Curated annotation (Swiss-Prot):
Keywords: Ribonucleoprotein, Ribosomal protein. Residues 128-190 are annotated as: Disordered. Residues 143-154 have a biased composition (Low complexity). It holds the Pfam family Ribosomal_L17. This is Large ribosomal subunit protein bL17. It comes from Salinispora tropica (strain ATCC BAA-916 / DSM 44818 / JCM 13857 / NBRC 105044 / CNB-440). Part of the 50S ribosomal subunit. Contacts protein L32. Residues 179-190 have a biased composition (Acidic residues). Belongs to the bacterial ribosomal protein bL17 family. GO terms for cellular component: cytosolic large ribosomal subunit. The gene is rplQ.
Length: 190
């Protein structure tokens, strides 16, 4: 049986403290950082680090242990699938506490507790086939770009007008519209 913490409990009873820390941990994993009192942040830090360490194991027993503390399945999914893989090479120290000064209403010392590495939006991994296709398309676009540029007009050509097609478009307008159509097709393929 774990030894109870010394001193007063946060919020009164041990059960209330346990639930409050679980809710703080859930908010921390949802948002990446939260602002709370220094005391609550210091009490939350070991719990959050234990949960991240369990999430790094990734097995079913660890998931059930974490679900015993954090009741929200979406947060547990985020913890196991997004947060834990970021800390695969780190053996602890997943959180940071930054003191922010006293609260305006009651002058309680406040702090921000945050995950050390910022939450990043997961980039989709491109497979080899699509990466090769995109590189080939990029090469084609680069090869076509210099060919479409028209040479600078010489002094004798300043008075001459651009050739006009049957539809009334100039050559430059046709080239611009062709380029726009190609770019649109590439965006639709991607």
């Amino acid at each position: 049986m774990p030894t109870p913490t010394k001193g007063a409990r946060l919020g009164g009873s041990p059960a209330h403290e346990r639930l409050m820390l679980a809710n703080l941990a859930m908010s921390l994993f949802q948002h990446g950082k939260i602002q709370t009192t220094e005391t609550k942040a210091r009490r939350l830090r070991p719990l959050a680090e234990q949960l991240i360490t369990k999430a790094k194991r990734g097995d079913l027993a660890s998931r059930r242990r974490v679900l015993g503390v954090v009741k929200d399945k979406d947060v547990v999914y985020t913890l196991f699938e997004q947060i834990a893989p970021r800390y695969a090479n780190r053996n602890g120290g997943y959180t940071r506490i930054v003191k922010t000064g006293p609260r305006k209403g009651d002058a309680a010392p406040m702090a921000i507790i945050e995950l050390v590495e910022e939450l990043a939006v997961a980039q989709p991994k491109a497979n080899k086939k699509t990466a090769g296709r995109k590189a080939a398309q990029q090469d084609k676009v680069e090869a076509l770009a210099p060919a479409e540029e028209t040479p600078a007009p010489t002094s004798g050509d300043q008075d001459a007008e651009a050739p006009v097609s049957v539809s009334g478009d100039t050559a430059a307008a046709r080239a611009d519209s062709d380029l726009a159509v190609e770019e649109n097709n590439e965006q639709n393929k991607a």
